[in-house]
Amino acid sequence: LVARKLNLNEFEEWITQEQNGYKCQVPEYRNIAGEIKAWNPYHGWIPMVLSADIADMISKMPLSTSISELQDVYNSSDSTIALSVNGKLTEWFNEHTDFMPTKYQFFSSKSELYRIMSTVRNKILDWALLLDENGIVGEGMTFTDVEKKTAQNTQVINNYTNNFYAEVSEIDVQQGK
């Protein structure tokens, strides 16, 4: 609401994407570290043995889902989260690895979700403090013309995005061992 009243389009767009999920690229802080495991019908989820280049490339997974979904997953998981790997990546693994055709999941610590939520919280707090430092206080949620102009000239938030290899469409929560 404040971003809209101050005509801060970039910040308003960022908040909207955090609330509703990202449709395209995600900011760097929304990439989580983890590892992809293959399903073995006799042993369950097993680590994949991959070349260092490929392992590095797939050791990060972007999370485009809304911040509220991340909060729900965080609250309902114990220590490990598992993300479904999309069909194209599954097909690539099945064609280019020595594994028999199978399914794959990306495993990560739930602390990665906490890191994302903390980053969002900190960005909002930093933004509020920056507005206050610049004299933008908005008495009763009403902003003067001077406050609006000052807000337009204040650098608010920078999100840096990177390209990524796969889309996350489902988050499956599995308890860590």
PLM regions and their residue ranges:
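Short, Lys/Arg-enriched charge-dense amphipathic segments
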Residues: 7, 31-40, 51-55, 156-168
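N-terminal interaction modules that seed assembly of large macromolecular complexes
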Residues: 1-44
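Long, low-complexity intrinsically disordered regions enriched in small/polar
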Residues: 137-177
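Generic hydrophobic secondary-structure signal
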Residues: 1-6, 11-15, 19, 116, ...
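Amphipathic alpha-helical coiled-coil/helical-stalk segments
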Residues: 51-54, 59-150
